């Protein structure tokens, strides 16, 4: 009987049925429970015809502070967000989060994945703000794993010896415009490029898969 060999050029096989979704948030503070979520971006990934990870679908929202949210002026100065600017086009959390979920579930279906996993730079921060917003709006059908994540700061420290996003991108030869940093969409795009670069570099070096399916079952 011929043994089936896992094809890791399919995304569903590369991450054990998980769909990596790269996210970034901009906030009005550091406390996910009390401080406002102001901006959210998310990008899904897919495999190209050669089994290399590439960016796929994206969404981006400016978000209205939830009722009673804390707004730290120092945080606004840091990220350059003017929450009173009518041109922001901000939407409530109960619009942004479900729309992101729709995109993620659509990508999961296309890639044959059973669940999504958050990828972010210093991922515990972004995951905490997303989870807090999900809880506030009582969102249903959350596609994300409740605690698993891929932290690109940790991965970049391992791969390149750099944990700061701009430094890691430079090491990976990814162009980075510091003037656009702290825009959720730009940071998500660069984090996506970095994550793909690290996964693809490991493939090129022969570091994945480590053993054949037959060897792994011995």
Swiss-Prot record:
Active-site feature positions: 182
Record keywords: Exonuclease, Hydrolase, Magnesium, Metal-binding, Nuclease, tRNA processing
Pfam families: RNase_T
Site (Important for substrate binding and specificity): 78, 125, 147
The keyword Nuclease is annotated on this UniProt entry: yes
Enzyme class label: hydrolase
Ligand binding (Mg(2+) 1): 24
EC code: 3.1.13.-
GO CC terms: cytosol
Coiled coil: none
Cofactor note as given: Binds two Mg(2+) per subunit. The active form of the enzyme binds two Mg(2+) ions in its active site. The first Mg(2+) forms only one salt bridge with the protein.
Domain of life from the UniProt record: Bacteria
GO molecular function, one term: 3'-5' exonuclease activity
Cofactor(s) this protein cannot do without: Mg(2+)
UniProt-annotated binding residues for Mg(2+) 2: 24, 26, 182, 187
Family stated for the protein in its record: Belongs to the RNase T family.
Known role: Trims short 3' overhangs of a variety of RNA species, leaving a one or two nucleotide 3' overhang. Responsible for the end-turnover of tRNA: specifically removes the terminal AMP residue from uncharged tRNA (tRNA-C-C-A). Also appears to be involved in tRNA biosynthesis.
Quaternary data: Homodimer.
Protein name: Ribonuclease T
Species whose genome carries this gene: Actinobacillus pleuropneumoniae serotype 5b (strain L20)
Annotated gene: rnt
């Amino acid at each position: 009987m011929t043994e089936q060999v896992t094809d890791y050029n399919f995304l569903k096989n590369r991450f054990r049925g998980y769909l990596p979704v790269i996210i970034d948030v901009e906030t009005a503070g550091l406390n996910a429970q009390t401080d406002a979520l102001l901006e959210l971006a998310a990008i899904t990934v897919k495999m190209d015809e050669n089994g290399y990870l590439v960016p796929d679908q994206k969404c981006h929202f400016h978000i209205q502070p939830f009722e009673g949210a804390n707004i730290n002026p120092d945080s606004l100065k840091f990220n350059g967000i003017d929450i009173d600017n009518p041109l922001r086009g901000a939407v409530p959390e109960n619009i942004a989060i479900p729309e992101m979920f729709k995109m993620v579930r659509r990508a999961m279906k296309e890639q044959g994945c059973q669940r999504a996993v958050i990828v972010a730079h210093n991922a515990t921060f972004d995951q905490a703000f997303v989870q807090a917003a999900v809880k506030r709006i009582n969102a249903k059908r959350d596609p994300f794993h409740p605690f698993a994540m891929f932290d690109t700061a940790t991965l970049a420290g391992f791969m390149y010896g750099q944990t700061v996003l701009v430094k890691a991108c430079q090491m990976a030869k990814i162009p980075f415009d510091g003037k656009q940093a702290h825009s959720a969409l730009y940071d998500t795009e660069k984090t996506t490029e970095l994550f793909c670069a690290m996964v693809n570099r490991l493939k090129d070096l022969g570091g994945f898969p480590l053993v054949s399916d037959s060897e792994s079952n011995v």
